[in-house]
Amino acid sequence: MKKILLGLLILGYGGNVLAASAAEYVQSVEQINADYQKESRQFLKGLNPQQQGFSASQNQQFCAIVQCYVDRLYKAADQNRAYLDRQYQNVGKQDVILQVKSSKEMQLLKRYNVDCNLQ
């Protein structure tokens, strides 16, 4: 996921303002990813290792973490459209949701019946 979002950047801008903004965007995405990894790992560490799936409340808690991640990624992309590669300037929230849902982590969690209704 991180590689895809970082790939959204325009690498060819020469202006200092544009370069600074692009760098800020990269830092923002890196921070969002770090926060998500920390929150999701904390949640997963709190689970009983013997359980076969998430309870309804656990599913709701985890999906809230994922929804926050999607919201923050989309907000970062939306606020920095001018610094994204032309092919990614029209990325929508559904595109971000599809990328997150197709991530390796989310695919692994499907076997535990984790299915988040992301919006």
What are these regions (language model features)?
Residues 4-13:
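Sec-dependent N-terminal signal peptides
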